[in-house]
Regions:
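Alpha-helical scaffold elements lining the catalytic groove of polysaccharide deacetylases
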Residues: 48-74, 88-135, 148-150
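Catalytic grooves of carbohydrate-active enzymes
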Residues: 134-170
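N-terminal start-of-chain detector that recognizes signal peptides
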Residues: 12-13, 110-113, 139
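A cross-domain feature marking catalytic cores of carbohydrate-active enzymes
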Residues: 18-21, 42-44, 84-86, 108, ...
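Divalent metal-coordination and catalytic microenvironments
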Residues: 7, 16, 40, 82-85, ...
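Structured helix-beta-strand junction loops
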Residues: 10, 36-37, 100, 135-136, ...
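Active-site beta->alpha N-cap acidic-glycine motif
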Residues: 1-80, 154, 165, 173
Length: 173
């Protein structure tokens, strides 16, 4: 909720790639994301290594099961944006995603923020993220990171001071 509060404060619309467990355990946050104009994309139902998923049936199930849960939760169809877990994929995955109508999205700026029990400090996060911003950056920040919730306001402020503005991925493609 703190991340959504910060985005609202800065009038920023973001893109969130969610998994099945997140929708199941935080349906109110997902509904709030939608209500506040954020884009919610597909990060698969179970967060597997997608480069290991070889069959169309298994691939389709990972994405469509999440689509169904999202629609059941929000009453809306999920937009066709997909981020492979851990950035792992195969060429056939990219083809299958495209055949399902998906835009596959990667990132250009990230840091190790995904270990919930081993979070970087505020200083480490700012040192890694502030100077590395660049035009057209797609920034990967995990919403489950306590550090990100703590530093997002300062990150956005510093980047805004450098002249940056922020868009959802569907506004870039």
């Amino acid at each position: 909720a703190k991340i959504l509060d910060t985005l609202k404060k800065h009038n920023v619309k973001a893109t969130f790639f969610v998994v099945g467990n997140f929708i199941e355990t935080s349906p109110d946050l997902v509904k709030r994301m939608v209500k506040e104009g954020h884009l919610v994309g597909n990060h698969t139902f179970t967060h597997p290594d997608m480069s290991e998923i070889a069959t169309e049936e298994a691939f389709h199930q990972e994405l469509s099961k999440l689509e169904d849960l999202y629609e059941k939760t929000t009453g809306k169809k999920m937009k066709k944006y997909y981020r492979p877990p851990q950035g792992k994929y195969s060429e056939s995955n990219l083809k299958m995603a495209k055949e399902m109508g998906y835009h596959t999205i990667f990132w250009s700026l990230a840091y190790v923020d995904w270990y919930e029990s081993d979070q970087p400090t505020r200083e480490e996060a700012l040192e890694k993220m502030v100077p590395r911003i660049h035009p057209g950056a797609i920034v990967l920040l995990h919403s489950t990171s306590a550090t990100n919730a703590q530093v997002l306001d300062e990150l956005l402020t510093r980047w805004e001071e450098k002249g940056y503005s922020f868009k959802r991925v569907d506004q870039l493609t």
